[in-house]
């Protein structure tokens, strides 16, 4: 389908995770483990933010409901979203230069990460989901 064709290569998404873990390491935090169910939820959210750029889903529910729908159990969760950046390094740099996004990346409560990116009409939309 055209939607799945828009999902970015796993290498771009893997690079987001690698750079995120590098930033955590430089600041004294443990690396996050990539979680398949979180990544599935991130892919759902990437398509949603292309329609409505918000932490609230198009249905009106919180972003965290996408985690539950993908079978993720958690006590604490966070979401970083972005649009327009052309590469993994560009988006992680943007997040690290934004206090709220940086706080998610450097949150010691989180142990798992899921990431996704989708290309809609030439614009890249990026999502990171975090869970404890």
Where are these regions (language model features)?
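Short, surface-exposed glycine/acidic/tryptophan-bearing loops
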Residues: 40-89, 105
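Disulfide-stabilized extracellular recognition modules
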Residues: 82-132
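Hydrophobic side chains within well-formed alpha-helices
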Residues: 12, 16, 34, 38, ...
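Surface-exposed patches in mature extracellular/periplasmic domains of secreted proteins
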Residues: 26-40, 53-63, 102-118
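A short alpha-helix/helix-coil micro-patch that ends at or immediately precedes a cysteine
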Residues: 3-51
């Amino acid at each position: 389908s055209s939607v799945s064709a828009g999902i970015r290569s796993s290498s771009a998404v893997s690079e987001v995770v690698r750079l995120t873990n590098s930033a955590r390491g430089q600041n004294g935090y443990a690396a996050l483990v990539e979680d398949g169910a979180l990544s599935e939820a991130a892919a759902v959210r990437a398509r949603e933010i292309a329609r409505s750029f918000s932490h609230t889903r198009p249905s009106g529910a919180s972003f965290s409901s996408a985690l539950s729908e993908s079978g993720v159990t958690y006590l604490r969760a966070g979401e970083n979203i972005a649009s327009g950046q052309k590469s993994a390094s560009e988006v992680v740099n943007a997040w690290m230069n934004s206090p709220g996004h940086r706080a998610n990346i450097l949150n010691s409560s989180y142990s798992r990460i899921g990431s996704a990116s989708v290309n809609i009409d030439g614009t890249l939309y990026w999502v990171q989901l975090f869970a404890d």
